[in-house]
Amino acid sequence: MYYCVPRLATGLAIVLCCLLASSLPVKAATGPDADHWTFGGSAYLWAAGVEGTSAEGDDIDIPFTELLGSLEGGLMGTLAAQKDKWTVIADLLYLSIHEEDDTTGNLVGLPVELDVDVKLRGFVSTFGVAYRVIDVGGTSLDLLTGGRYFDLDVDFEAEFAAQKIEYSDSGHALDGIIGGQVLKSLGDRWYVSFYGDIGTGDSEVTWQVWPVAGYRLENLDVVAGYRHLKWETDDGDTFDDLSFSGPLLGVKFSF
């Protein structure tokens, strides 16, 4: 009779873990360093909200401010190695999230007031290899292939009517992706770019689009844009579809 409650908690945990997982493409090296390996990275604040549908048919609508309030700690970073037309990218994320809330659950079709405590520890990695196929007149096109992987542990606890529910679970998923990024320079400093990818594997389909405007400084780029990421699944255990959308602000740097 309690099956729907832990399943919904696991779905929420996956939502939180996937929110910040991302591939952050970094432009390939040019000029005199094109024959040598160079290294760079990216850091972003993505103010994304979450919308979707759970496996039970419930609507999911979580604003960015609510997700931020649940964060206990985390480590997030992206590194890229570039040589000539090739770029190797690895994005790593560790999150610890703790959410306590009074909510209404659905047990055997009846609404029940619940005191809910959810703890999540998650690891996400997005990785890939990109190759520059066009680089002419301030316009470039990179094609990418790679994957997304996540691993998470969830501890769920709920109390209602002097009874207590405890539930723990773990899981992982791996999807292959293909994608590309086009970049157009607007003079020496300004540029615009558009990144997109699509993939499948343990999920039915995952895809994203990511338009960005950037400004080049001496040792880093300042970028601003908008990102939309969506997953669809056919396993019926957690959610039917999820989308993550919101503005972003960040920097790209090299060393």
Language model features: what each stretch is:
Residues G49-E72, L92-V124, F150-A173, G201, ...:
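Extracellular/periplasm-exposed beta-strand and loop segments of Gram-negative cell-envelope proteins
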Residues L24, A28-P32, K83-K85, G128-V136, ...:
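Outer-membrane beta-barrel proteins
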Residues K27-Y94:
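Short glycine/proline- and aromatic-enriched beta-strand/turn motifs that initiate or cap beta-hairpins
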Residues G41-A43, G77-K83, F127-Y131, T145-G147, ...:
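Residues on the lipid-exposed face of transmembrane beta-strands in outer-membrane beta-barrel proteins
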Residues M1-H36:
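Cleavable N-terminal export/targeting peptides
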Residues D33-F39, L75, D84-W86, G137-L143, ...:
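Outer-envelope beta-barrel architecture signal
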Residues W190-T206, H228:
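Transmembrane beta-strand segments that form the barrel wall of outer-membrane beta-barrel proteins
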Residues Y44-W46, Q82, L93-L95, R132, ...:
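Outer-membrane beta-barrel pore domains and translocons
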